[in-house]
Amino acid sequence: MPKKNEAPASFETALGELEQIVNRLESGDLPLEEALSEFERGVQLARQGQSQLQKAEQRVQILLADSEDSPTTPFTPDAE
């Protein structure tokens, strides 16, 4: 597992690590301190992933804005 301050190599790597953390937390077998540490790392990974997704969204909007043939509309995620 990467150190707490170490950024994952990619979005996919972070997502995979986050899934493993969720599985370990859901098992209920971790001692409290270890569960808190895992939760903290999970929050960090989720924030990094959200940031990466926002940057990717901005890049897509910029690329689409460069195309004069098709108008663009801001992305709005579906409410779940």
Swiss-Prot record:
It catalyses: Exonucleolytic cleavage in either 5'- to 3'- or 3'- to 5'-direction to yield nucleoside 5'-phosphates. It is an enzyme of class 3 (hydrolase). It holds the Pfam family Exonuc_VII_S. Its main location: cytoplasm. One of its GO terms (cellular component) is cytosol. Its EC number is 3.1.11.6. Keywords: Cytoplasm, Exonuclease, Hydrolase, Nuclease. It is found in: Cytoplasm. Heterooligomer composed of large and small subunits. Belongs to the XseB family. Bidirectionally degrades single-stranded DNA into large acid-insoluble oligonucleotides, which are then degraded further into small acid-soluble oligonucleotides. This is Exodeoxyribonuclease 7 small subunit.
